[in-house]
Amino acid sequence: VQLSFPTQEPGLVSTFVCHCADCRKITASMFASNFSVLDTHLTHIRGQDNLTAFAQSKTIASGKMMTNYFCKTCGTLMYRVGERFPQVKIMRIGTVDDFNLHETKLRPRREIYVKDRCGWVSAVEGAEQYEAQRPKL
């Protein structure tokens, strides 16, 4: 699967770290490093037919459905779509091949669900901190 996405507004909505229970579960880690883009700005270059979806609401704080799209070949979580914000795709920073973007345009600007942040994980320097979900991704 190969995607093309924006690295600035208006298509790039946000870059953030999430400490919620669902992100911990889906990443098998203590947090998820994410960025969100508008559907209208995300392009599937190839492999869209190689995606499989899994949806659930059990571990989502809002109780709303979250659909996860995985690569059938390697199992990588390519993006997520939430029922609360269906026009936005939530992507994982770690899926981006250009490591320079991790430190620049995709560097997390916000942290959400910091009330659930593990005690041995430090805040992202300079990132806005939110106890729970920020109103806008």
Region locations from a protein language model:
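A short Gly-Trp-Pro
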Residues: 2-137
